[in-house]
A protein has these predicted regions:
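Globin-like tetrapyrrole-binding proteins
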Residues: 1-145
């Protein structure tokens, strides 16, 4: 990621924070719409999970300038998520739900440049998470799928 992309993510995230509860609702609604088989991985009441999602995204955005810390955090997150039953195939669905949520929440502010920045960030994070969780580089997983 280049500095301009980091700036775009930080600027766009600042616009999401005031609507964070609605954004979390949109995200989980879309996630379960895209893949209903993911729903059983979560508790019935998503209140705490939604809070954790927003807190994690806040942390990710804050760490964007520190690539080493960001990757370390993503690796730890990946190892934890595999224990919850998350499979490698779920990462694409989560990414699609995240981008859809940002597009819906930001409207016209979700420009192609903003989308490219968020896509690059998500690919980096998801790649580090999958590698830590499954011990296989993300590039090798794509080839196997």
């Amino acid at each position: 990621m280049v500095p301009e992309q980091i700036d775009l993510i930080k600027e766009s995230w600042a616009k999401v924070v005031p609507i964070k509860e609605a954004a979390a609702d949109l995200f989980y609604d879309r996630l379960f719409e895209l893949d209903p088989t993911i729903r059983p991985l979560f508790k019935k009441d998503l209140t705490e999970q939604k809070r954790k999602l927003v807190a994690m995204l806040n942390r990710i955005v804050a760490l964007l300038g520190d690539f080493g810390a960001l990757v370390h955090m993503a690796e730890d997150l990946g190892r934890r998520h595999v224990q919850y039953g998350v499979e490698a195939k779920h990462y694409d669905t989560v990414g699609a739900a995240l981008l859809w949520t940002l597009r819906t929440g930001l409207g016209a502010a979700f420009t192609p440049e903003v989308e490219a920045a968020w896509t690059a960030a998500y690919r980096t994070l998801a790649g580090a998470m999958k590698e830590a969780a499954y011990g296989v580089p993300a590039s090798a997983m794509k080839k196997a799928a």
